[in-house]
């Protein structure tokens, strides 16, 4: 992981023990600055395995833990306040036998209702190709990628968003309001189209990446976590997760303040030109801003 994210492989002798592991890590030195922790039974470095467990084992109604008003990293510009942010723990581990959701809890303990797919009894539900096609044709959507059958990323063009090289120092209330309005409208439209509520993960981000290009998984891992504040950009409702990772536009007048946004640390054009003289393979799309 990195300062926004840690993916944790956790042993579980007891129900929900992986959550305790994550909470313990938040007390371990620099780990206290983490924004998002994902607990899994799989190899943490395997991004495809991570997508699989997020799709197959995360019930938004019971597997998310949000810690509000925690210590944050000084290098975290997306947070509402400097050095303070909310944290998100995602439990994507298998259910142990004693978990009340397993259907066979300890004697005397009641059963907690749980979807069959969360218990591993059937495949996780997902959206159809026809619904994906409908969503892709919505006005305002630039591109979309179905990461797994219940996980969709859509990209949008946000007018007035901070320039990657220069960032944005001062509030732009008009552009920020237009951004909030556009994102909310798209979320509502997609939720309405998905009347069966099969789409559990909906991510929206800027169109400055190539969803179908080389290295997209790693680029998304960075972009979806660095441009996102748990306290401002996460909506969990009716068993569905909405995750806004469009570049924040500084604002003081919205429901939640947005601080100045820094420019990305990038190689200057002269350095890139000097490297190009060596006739090396071209930079992958998703490494170029």
At which residue positions do the language-model features occur?
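Charged, compositionally biased interaction regions
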Residues: 1-289
